[in-house]
Amino acid sequence: ENYIRQWKMLEKGDKVVVGLSGGADSVCLFLILEELRKKIGFEILAVHVNHGIRGEEAKADEEFVKTLCEKKEIPCRSVSVDIPKMAVEYRMSEEEAGRTARREIFEQAAEEWGGTRIALAHHQDDNAETFFLHLARGSGLRGLGGIYPVNGMYIRPLLCVGRKEIEDYLKGREMSYCIDA
């Protein structure tokens, strides 16, 4: 909560689109925002993206997300995309195609819903990984920066915590999550 306030990520009246895959990181983010929404006074729309890669597992993730949102009385949208096809079409890796598709889907949801923020579940470990990827690619000093906590309408409230803290948080709340096999 202090990190969110420090970076002025959320304010009363915001409409926050939350990327919710069902994995530990996004479930943690969703629960934290759900706890803060009444305290601060903002709305949440969860958006789940099925990448068309993992078949039945992906359908199970989608059901998990829908059930979680119903329990918390948070509206949820689920969008399916054929990422392998998109990757071939645009000559990019599936990872890059997935990132591009998610960004477009989140931004479209925000536009249609009147969203003011898009919350993503990147954490400290992701930030370190990004830094070293940039370093390995030979980025100059300017390109060495990691992930920004606030970038336009995008916010990343978990950048101040690591993966272990996220898992501990979920364990402490006896909250399950999906594991990407």
Per-region residue spans from a language model:
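Core alpha/beta nucleotide-donor-binding catalytic domains of modification enzymes
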Residues: 1-20, 24-181
